[in-house]
């Protein structure tokens, strides 16, 4: 049994009667990979005497393990050559239309071997881990053909079994229409619905299905067909929605009872109302707006005020958010979206867990949940986002085991 002691525990719990927006002084008992007890005040001497290990985190803050609910983890290559285009004022869609953007990464991902893609993803997961992430969603969508989509999803499965971070796998063939279907989007939609999605489901390679509902990518009508087909096959649903143009993607996500609608920089007031009513989680990606040098951020405060559950994620990908550090999204949420530290922490713990259907097992410090914990070298939650630009993680614990400490990996497979 391991006993954690701290004068700043932010539990992210949603239990009635608990002030979930404040940290408290207390203790956490961990045994067999699970949280056995959470208490306020001093730990009883009986617990201290029974503990095999006592982690004294006084002067530091303990949170639940961070959950990155939106990543494009498995991909080939990088796109630093596009930075000059962005600095020259080229938009995301202009770069995409010129053969760059997603298609650049599709070519690199198709050309890379399974071993190369796996090693690249493992390196990224290690970076995520030392910055506090203990669970991550991972989308395909840089293959767009049967072979490469399956390859990337098989890598997700391998990563989930061979790295401390738990991986939640998402099929996202509807990321773009590939070159071989350039003038035949309808043919590509049929290919996904009739061939790829059934094969992915048969092999058990993805829990969720996602699609990019955007001008010149997939229309609302096309996206709805894809989502209905995915739901009929038994996939849970996610949606890239209202990222650049307000197409009523959020309303579609709510209509389809999707677990999450993601991006949402161009969401309408009606879209916000729809998400609040449906319970669909808004997964917001402030690091993406930052990297794209955009002045437009999703209206996070308004969403929260209207009752939308808001999560925050990195959107880790080579084109619009090349960072594995979820703390970057936290800082951007504070300084660009004006969210409070408690709102931010809930966004990367319990709300993010809801976005990937894991709220019953992770995302908060509660009895019976998985013992995924992060100890931050911060005396309180305000300091955690106030002291920006550094890795504030002191220790990362996964299922009750120490896996990273002071920027170093200490896990053993």
UniProtKB/Swiss-Prot annotation:
Binds 1 zinc or iron ion per subunit. The keyword DNA-binding does not apply. GO terms for biological process: L-histidine catabolic process to glutamate and formamide; L-histidine catabolic process to glutamate and formate. Its cofactor is Zn(2+); Fe(3+). Fe(3+) binds at residues 70, 72, 240, 315. Pathway: Amino-acid degradation; L-histidine degradation into L-glutamate; N-formimidoyl-L-glutamate from L-histidine: step 3/3. Its main location: cytoplasm. Zn(2+) binds at residues 70, 72, 240, 315. NCBIfam families: hutI. This is Imidazolonepropionase.
């Amino acid at each position: 049994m391991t006993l954690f002691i701290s004068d700043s525990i932010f539990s992210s719990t949603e239990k009635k009667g608990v002030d979930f927006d404040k940290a408290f002084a207390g203790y956490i008992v961990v045994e067999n990979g699970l949280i056995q007890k959470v208490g306020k005040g001093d730990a009883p001497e009986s617990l201290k005497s029974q503990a095999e290990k006592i982690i004294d985190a006084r002067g530091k803050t303990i949170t639940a393990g961070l959950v990155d609910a939106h990543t494009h983890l498995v991909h080939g290559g990088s796109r630093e050559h596009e930075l000059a285009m962005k600095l020259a004022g080229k938009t995301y869609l202009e770069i995409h239309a010129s053969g760059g953007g997603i298609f650049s990464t599709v070519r690199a991902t198709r050309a890379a071997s399974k071993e190369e893609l796996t090693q690249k993803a493992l390196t990224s997961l290690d970076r995520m881990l030392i910055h506090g992430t203990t669970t991550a969603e991972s989308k395909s969508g840089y293959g767009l053909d049967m072979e490469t989509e399956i390859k990337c999803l098989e890598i997700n499965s391998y990563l989930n079994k061979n790295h401390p971070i738990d991986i939640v796998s998402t099929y996202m063939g509807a990321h773009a229409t590939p070159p071989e279907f350039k003038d035949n989007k309808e043919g590509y939609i049929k290919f996904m619905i009739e061939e790829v999605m059934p094969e992915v489901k048969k092999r058990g390679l993805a829990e969720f299905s996602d699609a990019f509902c955007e001008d010149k990518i997939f229309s609302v009508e096309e996206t709805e067909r894809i989502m209905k087909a995915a739901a009929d096959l038994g996939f849970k649903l996610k949606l890239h929605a209202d990222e650049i143009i307000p197409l009523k993607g959020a309303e579609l996500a709510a209509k389809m009872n999707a677990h999450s609608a993601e991006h949402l920089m161009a969401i309408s007031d009606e879209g916000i109302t729809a998400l609040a009513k449906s319970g669909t989680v808004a997964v917001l990606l402030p690091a993406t707006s930052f990297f794209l040098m955009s002045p437009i951020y999703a209206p996070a405060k308004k969403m929260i005020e209207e009752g939308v559950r808001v999560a925050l994620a990195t959107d880790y990908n080579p084109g619009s958010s090349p960072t594995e550090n979820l703390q970057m999204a936290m800082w951007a949420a504070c300084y660009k979206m004006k969210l409070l530290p408690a709102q931010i922490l809930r966004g990367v713990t319990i709300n993010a867990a809801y976005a990937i259907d894991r709220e019953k097992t992770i995302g908060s410090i509660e009895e019976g949940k998985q013992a995924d914990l992060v100890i931050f070298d911060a005396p309180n939650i305000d300091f955690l986002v106030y002291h920006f630009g550094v890795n504030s993680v002191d220790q990362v614990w996964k299922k009750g085991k120490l896996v990273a400490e002071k920027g170093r990996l200490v896990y053993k497979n």
